Amino acid sequence: MAVLLPLFLLSFMFTYSNAAVCVCKDANELDLQKVIDFACGGGADCAQIQTTGACYQPNTLKNHCDVAVNSYYQKKASTGATCDFNGAAVISTSPPSTTSSCLSSSSSNGTPTAGYPSTGNSTTASPGTTNPSTGNSTNSTLPTNDKPTSSTITFPDSTTMGPSSSTSGDPNGGEELSVRTTTIILLTTIAAVALRV
């Protein structure tokens, strides 16, 4: 019986992990940018994917999308949000190695901002100015509060972007799987100890 307690504690140390993160599925650049815009406009900490941010590199839309949706999901999961984004994201227990240090399974304590990563094609410049990164002219501006004017983005096929309210997602961020794994290991350990007695 004295062996049972240490085995029980060890099983929790090695098997219980809340390291599930929300990442974007592979998609075209336009769809990834829409997901980034939604997440950043909805409260994700997107300062970290700005040019001076810790998670700017690698400078790819997929990387920026992973960081943005995970930040959004970690901040909103306690209110019932899921990692779905209309099918554009999924829960992963093994995040991409290029962004793993930027994907935390708990929300950051920073103030949410609505910055947008540079994709080489978009800019926040004033009307009629030139984008210094591409040399392309642009006539776009952001609203005065640096957030999209709507929290719902409409795709050309009239589907909406946003966390799904369905129960198909895992609102616990993978905790249920970890608890099941821990339970199985615990029961196996108890059975092994009982058979030796």
From Swiss-Prot:
It is a lipid-anchor; GPI-anchor. GO terms for cellular component: nucleus; plasma membrane; plasmodesma; side of membrane. Residues 116-125, 146-155 have a biased composition (Polar residues). Keywords: Cell membrane, Glycoprotein, GPI-anchor, Lipoprotein, Membrane, Signal. A lipid is attached at residue 172 (GPI-anchor amidated asparagine). InterPro entries: X8 (IPR012946), X8_dom_prot (IPR044788). Expressed in the sieve elements. Residues 173-197 form a propeptide. Residues 1-19 form the signal peptide. Induction: Regulated by the transcription factors NAC045 and NAC086. Residues 101-176 are annotated as: Disordered. Residues 101-113, 126-145, 156-170 have a biased composition (Low complexity). It is found in: Cell membrane. It comes from the Eukaryota. This is Carbohydrate-binding X8 domain-containing protein.
